[in-house]
Amino acid sequence: MELLERATPLPLAAAHPGVTVLALHGRMWRATRADGAVLGYVELLDTAEGERFLSKRLRPRAQGFLPVGEFWTADEAIESLRA
């Protein structure tokens, strides 16, 4: 069995009012609204250009995720989930 990395806070440079971010494991976070509704997820990726943050939503009634976009900062990834 593969061990998951220890959960760490998402490296946000700014506050995101109305959004709560919960670390799921070392490279994945869940973003929720104040009412508990899940906005989506942010995953840290290693790419040839450096680290990127992938924002994605869980697909309703289907398995897997729908990518929203890849971003250079965690703040951009969180903001993309507000739309």
Q: Can you say where each PLM-predicted feature lies in the sequence?
A:
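Small-side-chain structural scaffolding
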Residues: 31, 40, 55, 69, ...
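Intrinsically disordered, low-complexity sequence elements enriched in Ser/Thr/Gly/Pro
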Residues: 4, 28-31, 50, 55, ...
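Negatively charged, low-complexity tracts enriched in Asp/Glu with abundant Ser/Thr
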Residues: 1-34, 63-68
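A short, charged, amphipathic alpha-helix used as a generic interaction element across diverse proteins
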Residues: 60-63, 69-83
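A broad, structure-centric signal for solvent-exposed, well-ordered loop/edge residues
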Residues: 8, 28, 38, 49, ...
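Compositionally biased, intrinsically disordered low-complexity segments
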Residues: 22-24, 45, 81
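Short aromatic-glycine-(Arg/Gly/Cys) micro-motifs in beta-strand/loop hairpins
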Residues: 39-64
